[in-house]
């Protein structure tokens, strides 16, 4: 599971997830990418499930880049606990995803294999995604 090795502050407030992604919105490393269309908090388990789906489909060929990292702590209180008595303990970590963010990148495989692998990864994720190629985004910029 992905999580920070050490953090300056253990607990964070929730914050707002508004607007489009202005950083991490281009295919920077690979040839193909998986772009988020919706906003969400993505857990490290969801990221790992998508990564396994990609690596299982491309077998030995290709290189995978994970462009997101779960660095936001989410706290939870035990079940049937009364309100008050402080903020709960850190339960898990999430990555804050905005629309337009590239989640995964892939290189070194045929286009049809890359497309199928990224489609399988998208099915594991809680949001709608689209598959983009490096040349598609370069033409738009």
From Swiss-Prot:
Region Disordered, as annotated, extends over 1-21
Q: Which UniProt keywords apply?
A: Ribonucleoprotein, Ribosomal protein, RNA-binding, rRNA-binding, tRNA-binding
A Pfam family in this protein?
Ribosomal_L16
**SUPFAM superfamilies referenced in this protein's UniProt entry, alphabetically:** Ribosomal protein L16p/L10e
Query: What GO molecular function terms would the record report?
Result: rRNA binding; structural constituent of ribosome; tRNA binding
One cellular-component annotation, GO: cytosolic large ribosomal subunit
Q: Which domain of life is it from?
A: Bacteria
What InterPro entries is this protein classified in? Ribosomal_uL16 (IPR047873), Ribosomal_uL16_bact-type (IPR000114), Ribosomal_uL16_CS (IPR020798), Ribosomal_uL16_dom (IPR016180), Ribosomal_uL16_sf (IPR036920)
The biological processes this protein is annotated with in GO are: translation
**Protein family per UniProt:** Belongs to the universal ribosomal protein uL16 family.
Q: What does this protein do?
A: Binds 23S rRNA and is also seen to make contacts with the A and possibly P site tRNAs.
Question: Subunit details for this protein?
Answer: Part of the 50S ribosomal subunit.
What name does UniProt use for this protein? Answer: Large ribosomal subunit protein uL16
Q: Which gene encodes it?
A: rplP
